Swiss-Prot record:
Name by which UniProt lists this protein: Undecaprenyl-diphosphatase
Catalytic activities: di-trans,octa-cis-undecaprenyl diphosphate + H2O = di-trans,octa-cis-undecaprenyl phosphate + phosphate + H(+)
InterPro entries: UppP (IPR003824)
EC number: 3.6.1.27
Stated role: Catalyzes the dephosphorylation of undecaprenyl diphosphate (UPP). Confers resistance to bacitracin.
Encoding gene, per UniProt annotation: uppP
Compartments in which it is found: Cell inner membrane
């Protein structure tokens, strides 16, 4: 039991740290499973899905005031209505494409080789975008034009490939369309709520047979660690990227991907 709790803590930290950073939480969890045997077996695969709820609730807690004001204004405030429609429009491509091809992607592409290559490629793209002399024209995530929300939604679909990073794809898409770093990151967080919640419910339903009440304590520990870690990371991340950009995360991706390829080539 103690070993399982320690494993739950480690995976909770990995989820909480990487879910909202542009480094790919799925990619890191797959590599942790491959090289450190941290996620093997049906239960631990289901566990990785369950602790995503902790990260989702972290965003709800951090942005509760803003989200509550939007919810209250849904039937009377045109700006709130427009933002809700924008989030739904951005969510739609992932919902449709994910339902149609998610199973095939998981079957054929969820392997360490793909993760390592996409980590490196995504790191290179993130470095390139970060060094562009972009002139942001959108400074509030709640005020993007509707077509911009849709394009960001299609950018999110690229992250169905493991190692790409959902937050990385949406942040890059938003910045190329004129958002500043903070607004791009914040919209990525808002879009994560329906996207991750939908994936959570779908995967939870599919893996329901692997969960029992005996796992309650382990799941609770991982959930709590994921929640607390995500809150700390999101608050720190926004301050950091506003001042320094994304180069640190880009180089992290390149280093992890390269080390992973070396380990795989050596038969590890």
């Amino acid at each position: 039991m103690l070993a399982d709790i320690i494993r739950a803590i480690i995976l909770g930290v990995v989820e909480g740290v990487t879910e909202f950073l542009p480094v790919s939480s799925t990619g890191h969890l797959l590599l942790a499973e491959r090289f450190f045997n941290l996620g093997e077996g049906p239960f631990w695969k289901s566990f990785a899905v369950l602790i995503q709820l902790g990260a989702i609730l972290a965003i709800l807690a951090l942005y509760f005031s803003k989200l509550w004001n939007i919810a209250r204004g849904m039937f009377s405030d045109p700006a709130a209505q427009r933002f809700v429609i924008g989030v739904l429009v951005a969510f739609l491509p992932a919902a449709v494409i994910g339902a149609a091809s998610g199973g095939l992607i998981k079957e054929y592409l969820f392997n360490p080789w793909v993760v390592c290559f996409t980590l490196i490629l995504g790191g290179g793209i993130l470095l390139w975008v970060d060094q562009l002399e972009l002139k942001p024209v959108h400074h509030e995530a709640t005020e993007f034009p509707l077509p911009m929300y849709l394009i960001i939604g299609f950018a999110q679909c690229i992250a169905m490939f493991p190692g790409v990073s959902r937050s990385g794809a949406t942040i890059v898409g938003a910045m190329l369309l004129g958002a500043d770093r903070r607004a791009a990151a914040e919209f990525s967080f808002f879009l994560a709520i329906p996207t991750m919640l939908g994936a959570f419910v779908y995967d939870l339903y599919k893996s329901r047979a692997d969960m029992t009440m005996d796992h309650g304590l382990i799941v609770a520990v991982g959930f709590a660690v994921s929640f607390i870690t995500a809150i700390i990371v999101v608050k720190t991340f926004l301050t950091y990227v506003t001042r320094h950009g994304f180069a640190l995360f880009a180089w992290w991706r390149v280093i992890v991907g390269t080390l992973g390829l070396i380990a795989l080539a050596l038969g590890r």
